[in-house]
Regions:
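Short basic/aromatic active-site micro-motif
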Residues: 1-2, 95, 99-103, 117-140
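Active-site-proximal segment of tyrosine recombinases
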Residues: 18-20, 124-125, 134, 141-153
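Conserved tyrosine-mediated DNA breakage-rejoining catalytic core shared by Y-recombinases
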Residues: 11, 20-69, 73-79
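Key DNA-contact positions within bacterial/archaeal DNA-binding proteins
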Residues: 17, 100, 156
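Basic, Lys/Arg- and aromatic-enriched nucleic-acid-binding interface segment
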Residues: 1-16, 35-37, 83, 130
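Short alpha-helical segment immediately N-terminal to, or the first helix within
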Residues: 7-8, 136-140, 150, 161
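C-terminal catalytic core of Y-nucleophile DNA break-rejoin enzymes
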Residues: 42-66, 81-108, 125
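Catalytic-site neighborhood detector that most strongly recognizes the C-terminal catalytic loop/helix
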Residues: 35, 42-47, 151-175
């Protein structure tokens, strides 16, 4: 659950179909101007797209790979280069995890921690990590256009859900105290 949640929170990928459909062959290194970025190709609700993962996702995916005995012999770069058709999110027995088990485990954890609802009174779900991702990017000043491409949403949908947060998330920019990059 840990690696799954952290991956959701740092890619903007949808819980369920997109994340659980992810295979090692869908992950690759993207090189640009001498820099290496982790690219994740997903087939989702709207269409196929490639998302750039935050750098720390490498650690979460490597930790996930170490849970799968069928790929232990490979280091991370070898694993990516091998383009395996193996599911990324598996149990320790190499079986793909299910939405039902993830939801059940996540809900039990939230209950145990007393975190079932957010400050806004809404029930938290694994999909909440997608909202977390979007909010974090908007706070960093990422445009709704760029974010829509990353997340596979329309700018209209992003504006509908997040426009009320934008002035608050970027108060230092709107106040003139800090320039947007």
């Amino acid at each position: 659950l840990r690696n799954y949640v952290l991956s959701l929170a740092n890619t903007g990928v949808r819980h369920g179909t997109e994340a659980l459909g992810l295979r090692w062959r869908n992950i690759e290194w993207y090189l640009r101007d001498g820099e290496r970025y982790l690219a994740v190709s997903v087939d989702g609700k709207t269409n196929k797209r490639t998302a750039i993962a935050r750098d720390r996702v490498v650690d979460f995916l490597w930790r996930q790979a170490l849970l799968n005995p069928s790929i232990w012999a490979l280091d991370f770069d070898e694993l990516i280069a091998a383009e395996l058709d193996e599911a990324v999110f598996t149990t320790r027995l190499s079986a793909p995890v299910t939405v039902h088990n993830l939801n059940r485990t996540f809900n039990a954890l939230l209950d145990e921690l007393g975190l079932k609802t957010g400050a806004d009174g809404r029930t938290r779900t694994l999909y909440s990590w997608r909202h977390f991702y979007a909010t974090q990017d908007l706070e960093r000043g990422v445009s709704t256009h760029a974010l829509s491409k990353q997340m596979g949403n329309s700018t209209v949908m992003l504006d509908k859900h997040y426009s009320k947060y934008s002035p608050l998330l970027n108060a230092e920019v709107h106040s003139g105290r800090k320039k947007k990059h």
